[in-house]
């Protein structure tokens, strides 16, 4: 027997960066970047955060730069 899917329509996620009119994603803005990494230190995917592809690429570059500069950890401490 085929099972029926439950639940209604999911609300579309809003791009936080576009909604707040952030033009430049600075690698030194650690508070902004922490919104887009998990508690383990991994970069969250677009389907979780709702960012556009363009802003996701900018975020990824900024997070990686912040990691190299020592502002963000590569992995979280246990």
UniProtKB/Swiss-Prot annotation:
UniProt-listed Gene3D superfamilies: Ribosomal protein S18
Q: Does the keyword Calcium apply?
A: no
GO biological process annotations for this chain's record? translation
UniProt-listed Pfam families: Ribosomal_S18
This protein's GO cellular component annotations are:
cytosolic small ribosomal subunit
- Keywords in alphabetical order, please: Ribonucleoprotein, Ribosomal protein, RNA-binding, rRNA-binding
Q: State any single GO MF term.
A: small ribosomal subunit rRNA binding
Highest taxon in the source lineage: Bacteria
Q: Does the keyword Membrane apply?
A: no
> Subunit structure, briefly?
Part of the 30S ribosomal subunit. Forms a tight heterodimer with protein bS6.
Q: Which HAMAP family match?
A: Ribosomal_bS18
Function (record text): Binds as a heterodimer with protein bS6 to the central domain of the 16S rRNA, where it helps stabilize the platform of the 30S subunit.
Q: Which family does it belong to?
A: Belongs to the bacterial ribosomal protein bS18 family.
Its recorded name reads Small ribosomal subunit protein bS18
Q: Which organism is it from?
A: Lactobacillus johnsonii (strain CNCM I-12250 / La1 / NCC 533)
Q: What is the lineage of its organism?
A: Bacteria, Bacillati, Bacillota, Bacilli, Lactobacillales
Supply the gene name: rpsR
